[in-house]
Amino acid sequence: MDNSRYLKGEAKKEYVAFANMPFGEKAFSIVLWEATERAIKSAQEGLSQVQSNNQVASKRADDSPDFVMPPVSVYCRNEEYTPIDMQKIEDLLKEASLAVLGNKIVLGSSFVFSQKQGHTYFLDSNGTKLKTPVNLGRIAYEVWGKKADGAYIERGNSYDIISPESVPSLETLVADVKKSLAELEALFHAPDAEPLTAPAILKNKAMGVFVHEILGHRVEGHRQKIDSFGKTFTDKLGQQIMPSFLSIVDDPTMAYFKNIPLRGFYEYDDEGVKAQPVTIVENGVLKNFLMNASPIKGFPVSNGHGRASLGNSPVARMGVTRLVSSQSVSYEELEKMLIEKVKEQGKPYGFIIEDLSGGFTQTDSFAPQTFKLEPTLVYRVYPDGKKEFVRGADLVGTPLVSFSKILATADDDDVFNGNCGAESGWVPVSAIAPSVLLESIEVEKTAKSSSKPPQLPSPFSLPERGNK
């Protein structure tokens, strides 16, 4: 038992001390000493609360230790980075943003470059000493608008930047912005989605988000011993939870996929444990949980998935999550199969989910074990093969049913790079998946804003007039 234990009915507490970094070795030692003292006292207070709570709380279903000290590791890797020309990036984004001018639908846009580059240092009292490179750069843009009925529409794209060579050209960026504007206009004129359960294809990147949201948080090991957790998969080890042609591996040691840099890559986790691949599902059967240094029944040690953002205590988190299929068809064949399913079920149409912005999933025991995902680009596909944009569609369902509805996969694996939030903060993640055909999925209407669009025309709708 230690101070990291979840108290029944309460959120996880953090025992972290922050301090400004001074110049000079002696000054740094004093600041570090003071911060350590504050953290120790906070942890002692937390342990007292845990001990008191343990006297009155009901017996835990899993009484595994709260923490097991990881083995000692010593590792140092220096990385020399080629500087990225920030003026070039600024000029690139300014020039690309001009493509938005004159568009009557756009109410707002953003063109952003972010970068985290350097080295991460890790020390613990057990003797672990680590220095590992971190290189996360990203160019992202977004354009958005709003219908008179309050419906919000958006499109965008992002590019992961790890070197000057990975910066997209102006021609590429402008072409993508123009494509996004065309999609935004199509969504503006598209009909509203209607509630329906029908066959659907989740395109590769969208399927990556689907796996991450629906399965990922439910197989994070530390959650399995939290009494307030829904435990969808806790007792499913060794059982079939999806079709036998599917496997899921989380492998944070993967730095690239098809020359695409993976944001979820790391060499050591935030508890000093070497990253390692973990087979979560093998041939449809649940095999493992993602583990940090907080053991659970049957999983006494970490498998290198303890992750956190600065100022948070690590818990088990995803890294690079990959859905692997042993039976694939071409994407064209997958669309033909979708149309056949629509006809077979007598549905007016099916769906192609091109893009997902994210969503949320309920994992607490007091709530239904459901999910809600927010597509940003959806097509209706009619029995004759005709496609039509539709807006305002949300995907809802439950994990066990949804995975059982997978019928087939394509051979078009692609990467979703993003950030994932949980109690240990926001961490970079990647998901790799092929496009997938679902026998059915439930679509419901998206909530709309109650406010009207602006009364005056947007400045974006006005042509460029120089710097006057």
Regions found by a protein language model. Give the residues of each.
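Active-site bordering "gate/hinge" segments
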Residues: 1-268, 273, 277, 282-285, ...
